[in-house]
Amino acid sequence: MPHLLEMKNITKAFGAVKAVDNVSLTLEAGQVLSLCGENGSGKSTLMKVLCAIYPHGSYDGQIIFSGDELRANHIRDTEQKGIAIIHQELALVKEMTVLENMFLGNEWTRFGVMDYDNMYLRCQRMLEQVKLAVDPNTKVGELGLGQQQLVEIAKALNKQVRLLVLDEPTASLTERETGILLEIIQDLRDHGIACIYISHKLNEVKAISDVICVIRDGKHIGTRPAAELSEDHIIAMMVGRELTELYPNEPHVIGEEVLRVEHLTAWHPVNRHIRRVDDVSFALHRGEILGIAGLVGSGRTETVQCLFGAYRGRWQGDIFIDGKPVTISNCQQAMAQGIAMVPEDRKKDGIVPVMGVAQNMTLAALDQFTGPLSMLDDAREQDIIRQSLANLKVKTSSPELAIARLSGGNQQKAVLAKCLLLNPRILILDEPTRGIDIGAKYEIYKLINALVKQHIAVIVISSELPEVLGLSDRVLVMHQGRIKADLINRDLTQEQVMEAALRSEHRAENIAV
């Protein structure tokens, strides 16, 4: 019986650079293959070749699908064959309904009139297949990201998909939404639909995959049954070396208190009867990494947004720096007090995509490069930019390159460089490694550790508990806007943190574990 998919000796070059170099892979019907590799390894390029985003003739090699050679010139050609790709950036029209999105460009007609009734019934059936209980007439923009992801899958099922490519599908999803998505993929597998799954989250890769294919520097490193590979083996194949200690295991010299927060309360920006943060108090010390853990909606992000003057709703409470009360009503006041923040949503709040890397890095610190008569000191600015790029190992062909063209890891390091140009005493990192590969994560962890050695106090928020536990000296556990526990991190486990988050008492507990 032939394979569902064979990609034979695929090579795709851009000028003299081979983004994909002689890569071959096979896939069976009803099989889940995870494609792993660092950013820039060639994964996305290979999938764009498969889906004819790069058309036949623009690459070398051969693609066989369901026994026939695939010579597609447009993504519509591959969709007609039963191949669909869902990108991390969803291709839905937010102002249109679920039904309108599902049939966009493929509307059903009867006697020359839109067959709305049958489209509605079909849409309902497709939504039921992905376990999404929403009315087809709901505007897509009113749905959460997890629900939108399921609409994309339902849309693919409506096109009789036989092979579904999912590129970083859970990067912006909650743990619950991720669990639902993985269940849907298992259901698709049981119905004979094959999946190619691209993710940096190796726990998901291990949980969902039948086979794992690793690509590094455009080359095929190996394809093995998932059961034969540990996460450490996958990492070693991806980066070409073993990361024996993902989190820097170095003791921190914790100094005096630099920040104290007392009775911080923040209300929902629209529904002012709801408290997003409820009477939160804590302290932070020089040279300390304070992790904040909790389920999505626990109030973690809202807490640090208040500290940085970025919260859009009403809040109250007292903030002390070096024991002195300070007023922080906006980001400028926070930066003046020595606070810098890497935001949760890098693309929305951290960068200006159309501007160059250098412009993004210096945007918040232009006064440092302003000389007499308010003239910009270009030479000094360029010198500091070069130094920052080198120190943080930001890979870019030019400081003037649009930052949107960098990989996620390099964008994040550029945002971090922007913060460090402010010479902060307190650095807030909200989801610092979201959507970036394991090698870039390792570099960012080393950077955080180096900053702490310079006596900078760091607050880390992450939805990945291993990250919080691997980095932090102390962990605040939040639930429903309140601090449920303040835990000293001595071999602290994920189970202990989750138990604290779900504990019914509303008082904070100081626990040394």
From Swiss-Prot:
UniProt protein name: Xylose import ATP-binding protein XylG
CDD domains reported for this sequence: ABC_Carb_Monos_I, ABC_Carb_Monos_II
Gene Ontology CC terms, in alphabetical order: plasma membrane
Encoding gene per record: xylG
Record text on subunit structure and interactions: The complex is composed of two ATP-binding proteins (XylG), two transmembrane proteins (XylH) and a solute-binding protein (XylF).
N-terminal signal peptide: none
Topological type in the membrane: Peripheral membrane protein
Family matches, as NCBIfam families: PRK13549.1 (NF010069), xylG (TIGR02633)
Similarity-based family: Belongs to the ABC transporter superfamily. Xylose importer (TC 3.A.1.2.4) family.
Residues binding ATP, per UniProt: 37-44
Keywords of the record: ATP-binding, Cell inner membrane, Cell membrane, Membrane, Nucleotide-binding, Repeat, Sugar transport, Translocase, Transport
SMART domains xref list: AAA
Catalytic activity: D-xylose(out) + ATP + H2O = D-xylose(in) + ADP + phosphate + H(+)
Gene3D superfamilies in the cross-refs: P-loop containing nucleotide triphosphate hydrolases (3.40.50.300)
Function text: Part of the ABC transporter complex XylFGH involved in xylose import. Responsible for energy coupling to the transport system.
Domain ABC transporter: 5-242, 259-505
UniProt cross-references to Pfam families, sorted A to Z: ABC_tran
Enzyme's top EC category: translocase
Biological source species: Pectobacterium atrosepticum (strain SCRI 1043 / ATCC BAA-672)
Subcellular location: Cell inner membrane
GO molecular function: ABC-type D-xylose transporter activity; ATP binding; ATP hydrolysis activity
Lineage, top ranks: Bacteria, Pseudomonadati, Pseudomonadota, Gammaproteobacteria, Enterobacterales
EC number: 7.5.2.10
